[in-house]
Amino acid sequence: MLTKDLSITFCGVKFPNPFCLSSSPVGNCYEMCAKAYDTGWGGVVFKTIGFFIANEVSPRFDHLVKEDTGFIGFKNMEQIAEHPLEENLAALRRLKEDYPDKVLIASIMGENEQQWEELARLVQEAGADMIECNFSCPQMTSHAMGSDVGQSPELVEKYCRAVKRGSTLPMLAKMTPNIGDMCEVALAAKRGGADGIAAINTVKSITNIDLNQKIGMPIVNGKSSISGYSGKAVKPIALRFIQQMRTHPELRDFPISGIGGIETWEDAAEFLLLGAATLQVTTGIMQYGYRIVEDMASGLSHYLADQGFDSLQEMVGLANNNIVPAEDLDRSYIVYPRINLDKCVGCGRCYISCYDGGHQAMEWSEKTRTPHCNTEKCVGCLLCGHVCPVGCIELGEVKFKKGEKEHPVTL
């Protein structure tokens, strides 16, 4: 049971909660989107539609693992919806008729101004609440579409204007992360009439190489291709782009729908605290199913209550004041590790990592199989705490560097 109301108004549209399917295979037809709504998702971004009919490869997925974990990163070679345009429009109409209180976002992609304008008109007539312009799919076979467009501020601005000519609906521009400065493109979208930003789409990648056949994965008749990477591994990239946009003077109040590695309520809270107001998910659903929204909503609701927030909007962007340029960070002190020997299992990983990858400050007793920090050598990097498998190494004593004035420190 939710302890707090998770509704939020985004670009003038009220969402029952911030959790949405992102434009992808998880929202490819009426049946899938209906199940998502029934499970508790607040909105759906229907898989990108256009006049272009995708001819897909098989297989089309790959994944990246770390030791014995589930996959941490996911590669896909899918393009836009493979169904005919009329079939997709019919699905949009039916979804809005059957779920009038849920938010339906139509993702569109054209190859020229005329197509963008016409698609905008068609999805508004079909009942969509919002439009998301996909300027960022990294594996389109047409260079007039996808991330090639999203890297050009001029094209993004031009196509946003075309969409605004075709529709009066709120419109998001979906950003590609395959670019150095996302703010430049976001500003172009704003000039073109976009009401907000969706970020990020997938990262261009090669995930694995088959070492026997010397071919990238997945293998399609002896070949492979660069394509989009998603999942938990891209979350830091997404958070960085969102933070940079929300702290840009001309984008500070520009609404953002956050995408990239969200699969827990903690992930959701991080995106919200950096300035996203709605949240889109694909890879987490592909791995765990639509049901993950139940835990995400419950956890986020309890977090709001614990933190004393009355509404979701109150927490949006709060963390940005605490992210500063590297040159502004306090470099006057060292934090030494504190080792809880009651929890220590004597594995020695802290010692090995510090010796081979740090500053040889962690000493090791073969007799007791316990570590000890030599503060004469320790620089306070806390690598030891990050590699500890049982969490027995914590932040400990704060020591100010020679010549520095002592002052309160927040850890």
From Swiss-Prot:
Enzyme Commission (EC) number: 1.3.1.1
Designated gene of the protein: preA
Record GO cellular component, one term: cytoplasm
Catalytic activity: 5,6-dihydrouracil + NAD(+) = uracil + NADH + H(+); 5,6-dihydrothymine + NAD(+) = thymine + NADH + H(+)
Family matches, as CDD domains: DHPD_FMN
GO biological process terms on file: bacterial-type flagellum-dependent swarming motility; pyrimidine nucleobase catabolic process; thymine catabolic process; uracil catabolic process
Annotated binding of substrate, by residue: 76, 134-136, 201-202
Cofactor binding remark: Binds 2 [4Fe-4S] clusters.
Domain named 4Fe-4S ferredoxin-type: residues: 335-367, 369-398
Binding sites annotated in the UniProt record for [4Fe-4S] cluster 2: 354, 378, 381, 384
PANTHER family membership: DIHYDROPYRIMIDINE DEHYDROGENASE [NADP(+)]
Keyword Metal-binding belongs to the record: yes
Its biological purpose: Involved in pyrimidine base degradation. Catalyzes physiologically the reduction of uracil to 5,6-dihydrouracil (DHU) by using NADH as a specific cosubstrate. It also catalyzes the reverse reaction and the reduction of thymine to 5,6-dihydrothymine (DHT).
Active site location: 137
Required cofactor(s): [4Fe-4S] cluster
This protein's record includes keyword 4Fe-4S: yes
Any one GO MF annotation of this record: NADH dehydrogenase activity
Organism of origin: Escherichia coli (strain K12)
Self-association state and partner proteins as the record states: Heterotetramer of 2 PreA and 2 PreT subunits.
Protein name: NAD-dependent dihydropyrimidine dehydrogenase subunit PreA
Family of this protein: Belongs to the dihydropyrimidine dehydrogenase family.
Domain of life: Bacteria
Chain sites annotated for binding [4Fe-4S] cluster 1: 344, 347, 350, 388
InterPro entries (alphabetical): 4Fe4S_Fe-S-bd, 4Fe4S_Fe_S_CS, Aldolase_TIM, Dihydroorotate_DH_cat
Key words of the record: 4Fe-4S, Iron, Iron-sulfur, Metal-binding, NAD, Oxidoreductase, Repeat
Induction profile: Transcriptionally regulated by IscS.
